[in-house]
Every structure is written in structure tokens, then in C-alpha cells.
Amino acid sequence: MNNPFLQPYHTLHDTTPFQQIRIEDYEPAVREGMRLEDEEIQQITGNPEEPTFQNTILALEHAGKTLDRVTTVLFNLLSAETCDALEEIAEKLTPALSEHTNNISLNEQLFARVKAVYDKRESLQLTPEERRLLEKSYDGFVRNGANLSEEDKATFRKLSMELSSLTLKFSQNHLKETNGYELVLHTEDELAGLPESAIEAAAHTAHEKGKEGCWVITLQAPSYVPFMKYSDKRELRKTLYMAYNTQCCHDNEFNNLKIVEQLVNLRMELAQLLGFKNYAEYVLKKRMAEHSENVYKLLNDLLEAYTPTARQEVEEIRALARELEGEDFELMPWDFSYYAEKLKNRKFSLDEEALRPYFELSRVKAGVFGLATRLYGITFKENKEIPVYHPDVQAYEVFDRDGSFLAVLYTDFHPREGKRSGAWMTSYKEQWIGDNGCNSRPHVSVTMNFTKPTKDKPALLTFSEVNTFLHEFGHALHGMFANTRFQSMSGTNVYWDFVELPSQIMENFAIEKEFLNTFACHYQTGEPIPQELIQRIVDAFNFNVAYACLRQLSFGFLDMAWYTRQSKFEGDVKAYEKEAWQRTQLLPQLEDTCMSVQFGHIMSGGYSAGYYSYKWAEVLDADAFSVFKETGIFNQDTARSFRENILSKGGTEHPMTLYKRFRGQEPTIEALLKRNGIK
């Protein structure tokens, strides 16, 4: 079978040979991968010898490598470079993959062997890493229904398969709604207030869509965000805002209202089947937070700390709007970004657009890579021999301080059809250390949706896009520095409420003058970014910080409201949502809008009962970065400690243990309040 997935890659560093993969290779490779893993599992269960760590736990850890190889590419490309044919394959294979996973996690003979090893764990003289793998394997089975009766196991399978199909449907509906919307502008008058970069991008989109002489605004962030921030046309802002915030609740085939209800109820049923009172308790048992009480404590503590300042922020924006528009002007959600931007300019004379010329993408990239070199001694070398999945993508070899090969890094910066919105880091190959001691190094990718270059201008980033770059690059470092024996605990395979610490700590550098001075130069003149402009960035950093915090808290409360339910939901999704986040809302709520139906993070992503983890990690990152502030932001000893104690360790120990080893104490919210100027 001449299928690239089913033979050695013969590429540099064993990288994915994207150019050899054809659409028709996926299905046979997935089916063969499932067959091979079934065989590997049968070898474990059919082993006549007494179960040991070696012949059961380790053998299970190594099973399924072929399947993992093909599904990794399939599901990564579904996000980064999809097409109808790929979506059809995913839709076709998802139920089979779900059933395959369930067959393993509900395999009684396999569980009996795992349990036999688990029950004698005290006498096995395992290393801490081996012990954690054993506990993780055992828990994985129990959490997937291995201790259930036959009847309940059948129910568990049914629920899992339904969830699997519905989450895929939820995502596809949202992607299609996003891609299906266009706001076509026909006159220059309709462009009033928009910066040149947004006008150029809209003209470029119109050209791509065959609408010459027009401008097209879409619901993708690089188009939507500047329009809401700068457009002088209130009615058009309202139109776009309503289009964005009513996605997936129209009377069409992409409506997700019913799917939200089904997803929430299925997850509750699944958790209760396993003996948990609700889905949040099931999730949080494997989180740093541990219980919903701790999550609510965090959300409520922050709500109490930030609300007074957030009210002042909104009042200040409302006052400016009334000064400009008249005393009876009512500030609506589609006005907020627009007047907030005006106030920001008035207070700090900081126009995001005026910053763009200093943040040309290739220089930002050099700055971010340079930061990693300065902190950790690693270097990046582009290598065009490494295959990529789209011409936009660049591939780099990353070398450690001693010159040894560390990782492959792919960068994919710009939006295109077939690529979902947002920004993310992913792996095409994770790190592990083989039984022969060979350290198999990772291949990681950072994917963004930055404003594209135009025919006259290179890609110029906003300051928030610079932040996004640093954030995703922090995840990439977590993946690249991975140094663990077992793939399932490597890199970003950590508790969800810990995974954002390595990414968010990097964002702190964005407002450090010493860092900005290393790369921020005007793309035409080469003039370094003026110091007073940097000072204004620093001053503006906390602008509207409390309002932004309440917005994140609103998503956290919404998430917890859906997943702490102990009875079936049969109500009105929109009304329930508005009730859930009522205490966080400082602007009029609109009847027709709905977040839940497009809230991929908590409905189809990995953040169900986990959205609080962004704030949790913010508390951690502020607390951790205070060490860098004390020792000097480029201090290599601090960086080495962060790498050794946190970035390289993956999920090999409880995150609080790792954190305290780096920090010397448990985190508090004080550093975050101080950073945000709340205290």
C-alpha cells in the first residue's frame, strides 16, 4: 500500500511529508492505524505473563503510534487547511474513531491488567514519572467507564459517540456561518473612520471574492475588530455587531441552539453515570483547581476586586460618547470599542494604527525568536527542505544552547479560506524518550490570523497581535522544551488550568521597553520606535483592564453555569445565558444575541468547565513573572529555572508541585491586581 502514513517518512527529522499526502490516503491510513492498535492491545491482553509496568502500562503507552500519526495531521489540517473533501472524511471517520477509543477504554481484560499493576503500585519501586503514568492510565480507564456495569458501559459508549458527532457539527456550523457572511460596502462614504490598513484589507477581500470596486468586511477577527473599533458609521457597526453575535441562532441549517442543549445534557449525563454530581466536578478532578468551589472563589474574588474599576471605565467611555454625540446618547455594545478607542487616544494619544509601522511581521518574529535566544540560548534556522502544508507556512529547525537539535517549528501567520479563525499552537509530533534512551524531538506549529501583506505593504501587526504572537510562542516553547520519558505526559499535556501559564507569561514581555527596543523599528525608515511611544503603550496597558476582566469572568460564569447543572436543561438557551452572567454585564443586554451557540471553547473545544483557567493562569503568570521582574527580565538563571521546573516537565508531576519549585510558594492574586493597577 503506497500510503505515506504507513511507511517511514524519510524526511529531515522525520517531519510530515505534506506534499506526498493525498486526500484519499487518510481513510485507509486511519483504518489501518485502528487495526494495528487493536493488534497491539490484543498482544497486551493476550500476554500469559503476570501484568507488570513494562508489559502492560508501557506497552499501552507505546500502542497506537500509526493511528496517532495520521489523526494528528487530519485534525490539525481540519483547522489550518481544510476543504469539503477533508471535512467529509472527518465526518465519516469520527464515529469510527470514537468507537475505537471506547473499545480500548472499555476493554475489560485490558483494564483488569492495568488495575492489577495499579493495585500493587506501592511495591513496584517505580520512578515518580512511572508512577504518574500508571495513575494516569488507571484514571483514564475509570473516567472512561471501565468500572461501569455492562449496561452502563453501553450507555457510556452511546453518549461518547453522540458527543463526538455533535461537537464536530457545532464547529462546522460556526465555521460556515463565519465564512458565509459578507458586509459589502459600495461607497467611500461607508469607509469613514477606517484606517488605511483596514480599507486595503477590505478591498483585497473584495477582489478575492470577485467584487471589484467594492470593499468586503467579514466576521473574521482581522476584519471585524478594526471595523468595530474605527468605523464612524454607527448603523453599519450595529449591523456587523448583530451579525457577529447572532451567528448560529438563525433559522437555517447552521443553528446551534438545540446542539448546545444536547451537548450540555449529554455531558451532565456522562458525568453522573461515572458517579460525579455534575460535569464540572468530573472535569475539575483532573485540574489544578480540583473543585467548582475553588473556581467560583477565584471568579467571585476577581469580580469583587475589579467591578468598581470596571464601572468607572464604562462611565468614562459613556461620558465621552455623550460629550461627542449629545446628552441623551445611549451607549450600546456596538459603540463600546469605538468610543473606547477614542478615549484611549485622548488619554494616551495611542492609536493602534500608528503603532503598526513599528511592528512589521518579520521584525516581530526576529524579536520573539531573539527573546528566546536571550533567555534560553536557543536558535532558529529556516529550512526550506522541510515540507509544509501551504505556501504561507515556514519551517524552522530549532537548536539548543549547545548546538544540538531541539525541535521543528512551523509558523502559519495569515487568514485564508479553509483556515479557522483565532490563533493556536499545535503539535505534529510530540516528544518522548525511547527505551533505548533516544530522545525523539517534537514538531510544533504556531498558527495565527494576522493581517496579510498587501501589494504595497508588508504585514504590519497591531500591538494586540504582537501579544498573540508571544502567547502562542509561549505554548510552542512548552512543546519544544519537553523532556519527558512518556509522550502522553510531554509538553502541553498538562492540566488545562496550567497549560496557559507558559503562554501568558510571555505576554508580559510585550510591555517591557528593553524587549520592544530589540526589534520595533519603522518598516520604511528603520527608525526605532520612539521611547515616548513605548511609554504610552505601557501607560495604556491597563486601559479598560477591569472591563476586559469582567468580560472574561462573564465567560467563566457562563461556562460554570452550563456545567454545574445537576438536572436536564430544557429551557431557553439565550435567557439562561443572560441570567448566568448577569452580574458581569455593564452594558444593555440584547435579546437576540447569543454567545453559547458560537462558544467553541466550552462547547466543542477543550474548555468545557475550564474557561476559568485563563484567569487562573493569569494569576499564575503575574505571580511567576514577578520573579523575572525582581531578577531582571532577561535573567538566564530565572529562565533556566522556569525551563527546568515548568517548561520541560510536562505533566510528570502535579502542577502545584512544579509551580512551588519554581516560585518557592503558592500563587496569590496580589501580583495580578498590582500589575493591573487595581491595588
Regions flagged by a language model, labelled:
Residues 10-25, 74-93, 116-158, 218-258, ...:
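Short His/Asp/Glu-rich catalytic/ion-coordination signatures at enzyme active sites or charged loops
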